[in-house]
Amino acid sequence: GMHGSDVIQTGWALARALGTIEGTELVIAGNESTDGVGGAVPAIIAEYLGLPQLTHLRKVSIEGGKITGERETDEGVFTLEATLPAVISVNEKINEPRFPSFKGIMAAKKKEVTVLTLAEIGVESDEVGLANAGSTVLASTPKPAKTAGEKVTDEGEGGNQIVQYLVAQKI
């Protein structure tokens, strides 16, 4: 199976699965998964499918067979565009999350989910999985636990204390 597959293998398998869907104009992916934060899988999918890719987008619009997106970096905001079909990945700034209604949850439970086997998408078992991965994780370190931060009791000087803290942090 797919257990232990690296990003290249995962991208390959997803590209093969997407290739079974006729007429796909747009593939939308996130930047992270539950087992990694590389953000490379959408670009790998696009490469295997031979499609343009716009990654790490915070804003997207589609008009006349063209997709335009904004990517924010430390250097500024960049506008990117490509013709459809395309693969994009979006970040957490793309929208305000909405929570489904109870009715929506119940309707979703009734929807059929298509499950494809590796054989059905044309992926051989020796092309994926931990034993066949092209990369190896040598070590990992858990994220440090979040601290509560510094608390300020405002007795008339709270604003000054916050400013002093921000200056000390070079913020």
Where are these regions (language model features)?
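N-terminal glycine-rich FAD/FM-binding segment characteristic of electron-transfer flavoproteins
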Residues: 1-171
